[in-house]
């Protein structure tokens, strides 16, 4: 009996091995990640900074959501804020962001757009009813245009713009607007057909954690950080010191290492772009987000002050022997 049992066990084992080998041999190969083709773009030299409409932003009047006949599609997962995918009366899809980040993100997009950076298209709706979900105030509507493929995130430390002025400038702007949530998952590559063929637009998709404050002291970082808080923003620091021809910025956000090796030349370049925006344009960028007059005064004043700090930077003079 023992001999027969051993024989049966060996046969079963052999059959299992053969089935496993067949399945392995015919297993479908893993789908390779599609290589992105197109021209990478982060910033386009603007010839019209002084005349850009920072109230309507990158989408202009033509892209504004048509709120009659709004329908709910689904809840969007991920991120700090509640978000709903909706369709407007014109059949266009949007992601509606609810909560504190809506205002700050709307203004941040307009500020970047004003300087030539590529951005999402968004608008702030002061009050809207989303069927089945409720009525909300200050809701950011972010466009999901047909033909625009969201082709994954891009990395701050590994991208086609390493060492370029536009990438360094973007870092400086993130410190200027106090964006303390600098992480790769907040970035997106938008693939679309543009005037020059296929474009790969490198965009910061989530700019909600801006115009607030974050401490540079690690133990206080989570306790004191804020977003969309004009008073905190106006009280926070931007510039710390100059070391040789490098600028040390006061930045208490994630990925602080990104703020190392910022040159005076790059900082002045950002300042020169910002200085071309009029007070009216800056006010429009914040008015578009439904800030009060007092809040707009605070925010515009602080952006102006930080712009002047960038423009006034000079190399540190070292006295004594090397």
What are these regions (language model features)?
Residues 1-4:
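N-terminal secretory signal peptides that target proteins for export/translocation
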Residues 58-157:
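Conserved ATP-binding subdomain of kinase catalytic cores across diverse folds
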Residues 83, 105, 109, 170-173, ...:
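Extracytoplasmic/secreted envelope proteins and their assembly/folding machinery
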Residues 122-123, 187, 296:
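Residue-level detector of family-conserved "landmark" positions at structurally sensitive sites
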Residues 194-322:
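C-terminal catalytic region of ATP-dependent kinase domains
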